[in-house]
């Protein structure tokens, strides 16, 4: 009987130790940090905003949505100004009745102007100008617009209404440069994560070093549709080349030896449309495959994954559409398992 008693005691101790280990793992998982990185305009901040929707079942408050209004108005003004300047540079004439209007519109200072009904009406009038429309068709080849420009141009009638309140989709597409470090605590299936979004422009990257401690995973976002675009900071540098170079640096960094590397090849929807207008061979002269999404996307995926030095390092790649909540929700469910599994292995 004494033997059985001792055995039961050992079993009890063993169970307590096991429980303690599980509790420690839960505690460790409770501070899981995920770093969201990528070059400027890759769409990573849009993915960050998606977390708000996923975390609260899409329940952005009316007040929170209204806060995006000014950003959207600024987006509209600046992008129409880009079109007006591009039309003049290319040599496309606007309709005679809109020439003076376009000059006045260029005088608007987006950083200080207050949106009015008149500005809204003038924005609609300019967007409907045949010369502006012709200029718009030459985007990417002659000049660059924000990814969300077409979306807001096509929704100008709604956006310029007096009682306008941005929709969640409007908020997702509102373009604002991330400066500094933004954090969000999110929970997926009882797993707590701290998502850290850091500005992707070159001037912001020096701040990344402060985020490298105890990172369980790095989500790197690269824009698929940017293969024919130049950096805003340096027009002599191709965006995809810059993104690839940056990913190589991150993938092989000593800081992330024990971190999961998750690659989001983003803007899949825009990439599919871009291929119809701009063949991939215009960027990669050595590419000899078909100009289809399947062929080119696989080529790009292999190109990114080939930069790792350690052959045993796993890169988890996903094709994403940052403005599609269902797509991001599905992807996050997949990567949650990757992150949790990776962290559990380390404990």
Swiss-Prot record:
Start and end residues of each stretch annotated as G4 motif: 262-269
Molecular function terms from GO: G protein-coupled receptor binding; G-protein beta/gamma-subunit complex binding; GTP binding; GTPase activity; metal ion binding
Region G3 motif, residue ranges: 193-202
This protein's UniProt keywords: GTP-binding, Magnesium, Metal-binding, Nucleotide-binding, Transducer
Region (G1 motif): 33-46
PROSITE patterns in UniProt: G_ALPHA (PS51882)
Annotated ranges, domain G-alpha: 30-347
Protein family: Belongs to the G-alpha family.
Oligomeric and partner information: G proteins are composed of 3 units; alpha, beta and gamma. The alpha chain contains the guanine nucleotide binding site.
G2 motif: region residues: 170-178
Domain of life: Eukaryota
Positions of region (G5 motif): 320-325
Sequence positions that bind Mg(2+): 45, 178
Single GO BP term: adenylate cyclase-modulating G protein-coupled receptor signaling pathway
Xref: SUPFAM superfamilies: P-loop containing nucleoside triphosphate hydrolases, Transducin (alpha subunit), insertion domain
Role of this protein: Guanine nucleotide-binding proteins (G proteins) are involved as modulators or transducers in various transmembrane signaling systems. G alpha-6 is involved in the folic acid chemotaxis signal transduction pathway.
Protein's name in the database: Guanine nucleotide-binding protein alpha-6 subunit
InterPro entries on file: Gprotein_alpha_su, GproteinA_insert, P-loop_NTPase
Chain sites annotated for binding GTP: 38-45, 172-178, 197-201, 266-269, 322
GO cellular component: cytoplasm; heterotrimeric G-protein complex
Matches recorded under Pfam families: G-alpha
